[in-house]
Amino acid sequence: MTLTSAEKEMSGVLTFFQKEIRGFRTGKAHPALVETVTVEVYGTTMRLSDIASISVSDTRQLLISPYDAGNVSAISKGILAANLNLQPIVEGATVRINVPEPTEEYRREVIKQLKRKSEEAKVSIRNIRRTCNDRLKKDDSLTEDAVKGLEKKIQELTDKFCKQIEELAKQKEAELSSI
C-alpha cells in the first residue's frame, strides 16, 4: 500500500463520516435529512432523492416535489416509516415537512451518536495506518530507514485526517448546541 493509496482510503473514511453526520437533524431544514429515506413505489423500493426534488423553502421547512404526482402518499408514508420525528404534510402534488426544534434530550442523544461516529471514523483511519505499516515492514525491498520515513509520513496523514474528523465533529456539536 503506497502513501497515495493510504491517503485515498483515509479520504474515503472522511467523506463517509461527512455524509453520515450531514443527516443529523440540527433544527434547520436540510435536504440531507430525508434524501436517503426509502419509499415503496412502482413495486420496488427507491430512495426519495431518486423520485422527487427536495428543496428548503425556509430555515425550518422542506418542500418535496415528486417527479410523478401519484407518489405523494407513498412519499408521506416513507417519511413516517423512517422514524425521523418529522411530520409530512401533503399539499396537492407536494409534501411539506416542518422541521421541529430539537429537544434537549434529542440533542444529547445526537451528540452522543456524533461522538461515537467520530470515534469509529478515527479507528478506521488508524486501522488503515496499521495495515500500511504492516505492509511496509513485510516489504523486503525497503531499507529500515526508508520504512521509518514512510511510517512517519503515514503517521502524519493519520494525524491530519483524525484532526479533520475532530474538527467536523466539533462544528456539528456547536451547531447542535447553538439551537
UniProtKB/Swiss-Prot annotation:
One Gene Ontology term of the molecular function aspect: ribosomal large subunit binding
Record's keyword annotation contains Cytoplasm: yes
Keywords noted in UniProt: Cytoplasm, Protein biosynthesis
Compartment(s) of residence: Cytoplasm
Statement: the UniProt record of this protein carries the keyword Cytoplasm: yes
HAMAP family (alphabetical): RRF (MF_00040)
Protein known as: Ribosome-recycling factor
Organism encoding this protein: Chlamydia muridarum (strain MoPn / Nigg)
